[in-house]
Amino acid sequence: MMRPMTASAIPDGVLVLAGTPIGRVADAPPRLAEELAGAGVIAAEDTRRLRCLLTDLGVETSARVVSYFEGNESARTPVLLEALLAGERVVLVTDAGMPSVSDPGYRLVAAAVEAGVVVTAVPGPSAVLTALAVSGLPVDRFCFEGFLPRKAGERARRLAGLAGEERTLVFFEAPHRTEAALAEMATAFGGDRRAAVCRELTKTYEEVVRGPLADLVAWAADGVRGEVTLVVAGATPAAVDTDPDALRAAVRSEEHTSELQSPMYLVCRLLLEKK
């Protein structure tokens, strides 16, 4: 039987994607402290938050700490790859959850794989899986969409393209945009589509609000705070009227209102194009 690989057994010149807590530091995987302590380089989305994490975990490290976030990811990737090729162990951490999942990391992983560098992970907490588990919605098949586009037209097109998706959908959203996102989902998917707003998962003020999208829009009108993950039930075959005459009538109705970028207009146009 093979022994489990510990940090000391992992060869140098390896990229370690380390999952960090999404709320409570007690949820940190035991291996996280070991990997941080033994790293040659730690690439962190926010070096200040990394320092706090090291303190909370009681970890002392002699690693070289570098920032690695969306704004410098392209420039820093070659630097970190050079360190990996020189035989250093690079540990990548983001503010919360797993690197690469709606967080920095993909470019470095792709570059490391291309260069033949070993890539491994310290599995950790995931807001996506946690939200799915507590949502009360089907989790046998799901689709993670990350953050919706900020521009209204792009956001409407994204939701229109997902209107007929039968898998459960998971989104990240900023608290100040949650009400608008729910309203646009209600328009694109139907106000009776079931969903769950998962807020501050694993933290002191954790809250999961479940119900039809229309009800959740009304709930969010009072304001939403904290980290938000949205889980939306997938479409049922009967939920989307694909009768060509009905779709053309809906398109004409939207054209008369000049709302040519509305989710409803785009949904109907997309469905007609598939006919």
Language-model features: locations:
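Conserved helicase motor
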Residues: S67-S74, L148-P149
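Short amphipathic alpha-helix with an adjacent loop that forms part of the alpha/beta core around
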Residues: A7-S8, T77-L85, G161
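Beta-strand/loop-alpha-helix module characteristic of Rossmann-like adenine-cofactor folds
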Residues: M2-V14, S126-E254
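Short glycine-cluster motifs
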Residues: L85-P149
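Glycine-rich, flexible N-terminal cofactor/catalytic loop recognition
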Residues: M2-E70
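Short active-site oxyanion
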Residues: L36-I42, G116-T120, T168-L169
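Single conserved hydrophobic/aromatic residue that forms the stacking wall/gate
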Residues: E255-K275
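Structural motif
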Residues: E45, Y68, V93-D95, T120-V122, ...
